[in-house]
Amino acid sequence: MNPIEIQRPDFFTFRLIRSLKSLLLPAMLLGTAAVLPAPGANANPSTAESMVIAPNLESFTLENGLQVVVIPDRRAPVVTHMIWYKVGSADEPEGQSGVAHFLEHLMFKGTKDNPDGVFSKMIAERGGQENAFTSADYTAYFQRVAKEHLPLMMALEADRMENLVLSDEVVTPERKVVLEERRQRVDSEPGSRLREALNAITFVNHPYGSPVIGWQSEIEALNKEAAIAFYDRFYTPNNAVVVIAGDITVEDVRKLADETYGKIARRAEPGERLRPKEPPLSGERRIAVSDPRVRQESISQTWVVPSQSTGEGRIPEALDILAYVLGQGPSSRLYKSLVLDQEVAISAGAYYQSGALDDGRFGFYASPRPGHTLEEMEELIALELQKLLSGGVTEEEIDRAKNSMIASAIYAQDSQSGLARLFGSALTTGLTIEDVQTWPSQVRAVTIDDVLDVARTYLKGMPVVGELRIETPTEPAAALSDDQQLKDKS
């Protein structure tokens, strides 16, 4: 319950292309159903110019400002019901890092009509699945149930949107749960500690530099008043998006939405999501985490770049293709050079974190084989980047990237829950339904010049570097003999 989506390369386009393949697996967070042929899906990438993602999607807005998105899918008598709030850790008041995630925990503590535990019990008794997650830009809750239980799911979510009951008796022990979660998932994991430190030195001025789970000292200070204030400001219908995918009709959903969410009044106007901008990187920023528990050393390099939301024109799609050419898949330049040809690395790749409300990140990573070093990895990554900057990319590389990306998007439509998550995350990070639906045609329009332009514009400066190292225990100095000690004193 309540996994945190700590910032990592797994946002909008990157998720759409690569990670949505994993959304087809039952083990995925959203617990998707078995894969069935998607209605109207065409797996031929050559049709991408006219391809529209979820063409039967419809959307409407209630009088209280709640946006509702409906994605009919009649292949199985089940529905995925998700509610997305346009608030995440980057929207937290100063000094209250972790309150967004803390409130996510507290949302399961009940209302007057549905006390602590009743919500989850009702879902379990009906054979359903539920979960929730917090990121820097949004907080989401979902249930997956047989379609006849959708009215109950909407009633339960609407109830806790308006009637959450909190007390010190509930808040205090849950704060201890979150602190223990931090100890287990961050403090005890060298890789998580490095990611947290790397975020902090990448975003010094922007709140993306604070961890989603929060800093320990600030979690310890969170209380009932902080949670209620956050809830009252942001958990209001005009700051939320409901996405329902499955065996339903738009007419039925509209009626249910009016009867449940439609009765909730606006509690607040959250206001425009204005955040401090990150100044251009100057000088070198480098962090290393050494720990005896590290099993495999690795190095990462990161640049702050435009996201799908902040990038103009074809910049986001060009960055995505650049990441694919350089480091995604066995035919990518980094993998082929470092892993296959030179056999100096166990893994090597690139990513583009595009699905953020503000700027995203572009990065490289590599893990050396035994007998090779992180310094060697860094030099070889720089060499491959320089080759691309000076020699360009080929039409074949661009086409291969486009075909793979679009094919993944086509097959991803087989996942009911995956589509619900895709549109929910997009609509809470500054994008529109049209942005998502027409993404394949935007990818097809990218040119070689577009890819080279973004490479030369955004990867020309020094990256932020993170190193994960195996800590070698320092052997204690050998004890001096009595004769040696006497000799040293003379």
Q: What are these model-derived regions, one by one?
A:
Residues 1-18:
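N-terminal secretory signal peptides that target proteins for export/translocation
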Residues 15, 19-35:
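Bacterial N-terminal signal peptides
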Residues 40-89, 114-149, 185-238, 263-309, ...:
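Non-catalytic beta-strand/loop surface segments
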Residues 88-96:
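Short pre-active-site segment immediately N-terminal to the catalytic Zn-binding motif
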Residues 94, 151-154, 255, 310-315, ...:
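Solvent-exposed, non-transmembrane alpha-helical starts
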Residues 97-111:
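Active-site SXXK
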Residues 109-114, 161-170, 393-394:
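Short, polar/flexible loop-turn hinges at active-site or ligand-entry regions and domain interfaces
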